[in-house]
């Protein structure tokens, strides 16, 4: 069956070339990890009865511009980092970021080793069976990266019969496997996908638009380009343990506060070079 995508055109983003500091890994689906056990041993401070609590935040810090570690300071930086710190400030709690593998985030939430997960996570009905999500804080989607001199792929339909690179277990892999007659090549890391594209071993990479854009600008060296069309439209949310209504309430309240006072828009423009969509601010 031919894969049919709705085309959602995105606004161009202006990027600051800070260097592609860490390998990017595309967000992976949670379906295979729901029953996995977390390996952490420290109970989050959220459970302690202190006047000012510390929110333990889990993220895979290999997803610039959402989250990464500065190569010099070793501090966590990115859109997700700034958003959760701003929410913490609005709600009066401290934030401690812990770097976990993406596929360990849901298990860590379920066992209480982290309080929230913020990691370019798409809100979906399947994931909502395991965790509760905040209101959206970013509108994303899957995009396409091709070599700069490629003129044969300009839209979703052009992917038919092509060689497509995706990272294992990702939403990009799921989409690629629906493309008619496509040869899907699966890699452990997203950076391997981009390298294979530049070596002309594949025709295109399917991956999230923000990380596509970041790679093209900071590490593509003019040899690749991101197409100005999205294959899907996805809302990103902050995940909390299923049933933790009090924490979810505070996260949503803090998110609403920073959207209203202008801090959200300031952070958004810092990392994406443009103002957030009006519909994103209206939630």
State where each predicted segment sits:
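A ligand-binding cleft/hinge motif common to bilobed small-molecule-binding domains
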Residues: 104-107, 119-129, 175-178, 198, ...
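Extended ligand-binding regions for polar small-molecule ligands
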Residues: 81-90, 150, 157, 163, ...
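N-terminal export leaders
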Residues: 27-31
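Short helix-initiation/N-cap motifs at beta->coil->alpha
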Residues: 81, 97-107, 151, 168-170, ...
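Periplasmic-binding protein-like
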Residues: 61, 139-146, 209, 213-256, ...
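A conserved helix-loop-strand patch within extracytoplasmic ligand-binding domains
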Residues: 93, 97, 121-123, 135-184
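Ligand-binding clefts/hinges and TM-proximal coupling segments of bilobed small-molecule sensing domains
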Residues: 171-185, 223-226, 255-283
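Extracytoplasmic small-molecule ligand-binding "clamshell" domains
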Residues: 49-121, 129, 261
